[in-house]
């Protein structure tokens, strides 16, 4: 063999060896150079539910939520994320109904015990400004707490996730488009629900005083117990902030409309609407209270025929954020619901926040009131990693004839959390 051929072969070997070493090194770097996420939330919850029989109206729970996850770095535009979640009941879980233990005579505290894989997905970035995620993941097209149609139910200890393939693209200026397909909903109770659900969400932020969102969610639940939730929803949302007087005072607004109809094997034929209108002001201050937001809101979930099967429903939402924190209206009543409510958010120094809201809840298609609710939440962050909070919600039922929510209900929480 000639010296030139020997040199050539040796050169090819060197390149191949170097590439393999580099590839292996890059893979190891991506695998080990990721980010760990770790969180703990210890929480006490107390409930008084007058709809239960005497002697079974009070319930208490002390639970702890622990999450441990890891997101790898990118290797040839591929990355992965896995997260484990554990919910432990520190007291006796026979003191409340967690939604899975069968203690239906007791008030509900929806924090069931268990350990599970909360998220596990593969991410791909082969196309510019496009991310594909395949696997179990948290879907939140909107920032918390505005998860009206898709959310994680992040207030509960066991979060909701979806098994899905999701494509997100930001190629167009000021535009984010999300297209996906969900085949399984993993609930807060540790159970799952099969579905065939193409989804679409598009947001545009190019206007100075308005942000626009359009969406289409075709949630075809396929198991017999969930067929009433099979629905197609499409809608539009606009919200924005407009300076008034000076940059320290701003007008805030939101307007939203959605229409929903039955789909798949849902035996209930219906068409129902959703709409939201709200406006208020946010003012920046220069004392202990750094800002105050006040707003008035009006939200309606219609019923088509006055039956439970023909109401506007949101089965994948973070329902806790709507119609009051007592969770009395997670399922839209047969008569629909109108919620007129007022909210005050005060932000202070030392990462302190106070939220107070007052709800006036009425039937949408009948002439009676459900009741009123007052919600109060005080929270503070410490060193950016620790959070402490107190939260109280009380529902005062109306005595109107026909009221299907005629029992008083109150909840109290105290919690401390850590997030790394």
Where are the model-predicted features located?
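Envelope-exposed proteins and targeting segments
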Residues: 34, 116-118, 161-163
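Transmembrane beta-strand segments of Gram-negative outer membrane beta-barrel proteins
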Residues: 26-49, 76-82, 175
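Bacterial N-terminal signal peptides that target proteins for export
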Residues: 1-8
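Outer-membrane beta-barrel biogenesis signature
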Residues: 13, 20-36, 305-318, 325-337, ...
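Signature for the C-terminal beta-barrel architecture of outer-membrane proteins
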Residues: 128-132, 152-307, 342, 347, ...
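One-face residue pattern on beta-strands with alternating periodicity enriched for small/polar residues
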Residues: 37-41, 65-69, 119-123, 133, ...
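Outer-membrane beta-barrel "beta-signal"
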Residues: 408-420
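Surface-exposed loop and membrane-interface regions of Gram-negative outer-membrane beta-barrel proteins
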Residues: 45-64, 72-121, 126, 139-156, ...
């Amino acid at each position: 063999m000639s010296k030139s051929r020997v040199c050539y072969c040796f050169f090819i070997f060197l390149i191949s060896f170097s590439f393999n070493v580099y590839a292996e090194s890059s893979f190891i770097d991506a695998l080990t150079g990721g980010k760990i996420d770790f969180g703990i939330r210890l929480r006490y919850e107390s409930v008084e539910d007058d709809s239960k029989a005497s002697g079974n109206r009070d319930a208490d729970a002390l639970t702890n939520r622990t999450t441990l996850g890891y997101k790898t770095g990118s290797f040839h535009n591929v990355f992965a994320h896995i997260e484990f979640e554990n919910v432990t009941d520190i007291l006796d879980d026979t003191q409340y109904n967690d939604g899975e233990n069968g203690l239906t005579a007791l008030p509900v505290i929806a924090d069931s015990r268990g350990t599970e894989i909360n998220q596990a997905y593969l991410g791909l970035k082969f196309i510019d400004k496009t991310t594909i995620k395949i696997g179990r993941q948290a879907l939140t097209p909107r920032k918390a707490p505005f998860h009206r149609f898709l959310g994680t139910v992040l207030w509960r200890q066991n979060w909701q996730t979806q098994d899905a393939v999701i494509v997100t693209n930001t190629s167009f200026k000021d535009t984010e488009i999300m297209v996906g397909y969900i085949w399984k909903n993993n609930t807060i109770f540790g159970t799952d629900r099969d579905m065939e659900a193409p989804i679409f969400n598009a947001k545009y932020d190019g206007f100075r005083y308005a942000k626009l969102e359009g969406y289409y969610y075709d949630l075809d639940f396929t198991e017999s117990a969930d067929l009433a939730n099979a629905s197609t929803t499409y809608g539009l949302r606009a919200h924005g902030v407009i300076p008034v007087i000076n940059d320290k005072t701003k007008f805030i607004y939101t307007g939203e409309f959605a229409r929903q109809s039955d789909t798949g094997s849902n035996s209930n034929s219906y068409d129902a609407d959703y709409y939201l209108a709200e406006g208020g002001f946010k003012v920046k201050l220069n004392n202990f209270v750094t800002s105050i937001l006040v707003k008035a809101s009006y939200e309606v979930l219609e019923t088509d025929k006055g039956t439970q099967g023909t109401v506007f429903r949101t089965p994948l939402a973070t329902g806790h954020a709507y119609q009051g924190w007592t969770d009395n209206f997670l399922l839209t009543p047969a008569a629909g619901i109108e919620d007129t409510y007022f909210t005050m958010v005060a932000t202070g120094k030392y990462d302190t926040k106070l939220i107070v809201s007052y709800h006036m809840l009425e039937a949408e298609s009948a002439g009676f009131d459900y009741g009123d609710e007052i919600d109060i939440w005080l929270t503070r962050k410490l060193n950016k990693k620790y959070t402490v909070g107190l939260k109280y919600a009380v529902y005062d039922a109306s005595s109107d004839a026909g009221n299907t929510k005629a029992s008083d209900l109150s909840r109290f929480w105290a919690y401390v959390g850590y997030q790394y």
